[in-house]
Swiss-Prot record:
Pfam families: Peroxin-3. It comes from Bos taurus. Belongs to the peroxin-3 family. It is a multi-pass membrane protein. Residues 120-136 are annotated as: Interaction with PEX19. The keyword Phosphoprotein does not apply. This is Peroxisomal biogenesis factor 3. Its main location: membrane. The chain crosses the membrane at residues 16-36, 117-140. It comes from the Eukaryota. Involved in peroxisome biosynthesis and integrity. Assembles membrane vesicles before the matrix proteins are translocated. As a docking factor for PEX19, is necessary for the import of peroxisomal membrane proteins in the peroxisomes. Residues 1-15, 141-373 are cytoplasmic.
Amino acid sequence: MFRSTWNFLKRHKKKCIFLGTVLGGVYILGKYGQKKIREIQEREAAEYIAQARRQYHFESNQRTCNMTVLSMLPTLREALMQQLNSESLTALLKTRPSNKLEIWEDLKIISFTRSIVAVYSTCMLVVLLRVQLNIIGGYIYLDNAAVGKNGTTVLAPPDVQQQYLSSIQHLLGDGLTELITVIKQAVQKILGSVSLKHSLSLLDLEQKLKEIRDLVEQHKSSSWINNDGSKSLLCHYMMPDEETPLAVQACGLSPRDVTTIKLLNETRDMLESPDFSTVLNTCLSRGFSRLLDNMAEFFRPTEQDLQHGNSINSLSSVSLPLAKIIPIINGQIHSVCSETPSHFVQDLLMMEQVKDFAANVYEAFSTPQQLEK
């Protein structure tokens, strides 16, 4: 039997060699295919885990953003109430001074200015912190992902994070003071000549706020000018110009300072982007809409209006003398800058445009390939 098998193999030698080669190739290809499939599965699993880890870190970062905004609102409110102290004027009016009319005029300007600045600065705080914390969050994610790898340099050490995030103080300090000046001038121009006895409906009030916004957002600034000569919307209130104390030092910059300047420049690039401008404008529109909603409660028709059959759905059906509107607008700062989640702040924090923008910023700074560009 062995001899017959051997003779068969000798007679079909070439065929057997070919068959053996084919079977061997199939076996090798099968092993290679299994190895590649296993590698692909392992890579996909690693990518899925990395993506899940990054998504978890992103969501945690957004919660941090929200808590940071809420924690900073009392500081913002205190700064506004200190620089625009309407309470002292109100107390003065109770003493029945001889210049009562003059004090009322001052109270009119300060009350409107305070609430309008509160809307602007709160919207700026929400969007600016979204940018800053997602930039630094992206760096922290990359640092955490690189833990244990040889030759890796920490991108954002804690001291750099602290130095970078302290730049928010510009919005709460010099930026806020400049914003107050600009808005106060706009309020004076639009409402300065309006009599305290003049009645305004909610629709009239909306138009006045629009006129004030137009003046504020067209205000010229020596810095933050785009290449085409147009002004970047409101950016200089959120960050100082590029001549920062760190940047102007001729020598002696530490590695920490260099990294911080890099982060600030990246933030400045984000603030100058069309996406940032769009998101901020959307927040401002929502903010002023919510401000009017809050005030609408005081423009409800009276029993007499209802008896006369006046339309209760019209924004112009109820009017109030400006003197009665002043205390209403004056008190809005406590709703706008409330550290307890109010409808005003919640609306801003939960806006889809803000969430999408935050995701894009985080994506850009948590991806090594994007960061190297």
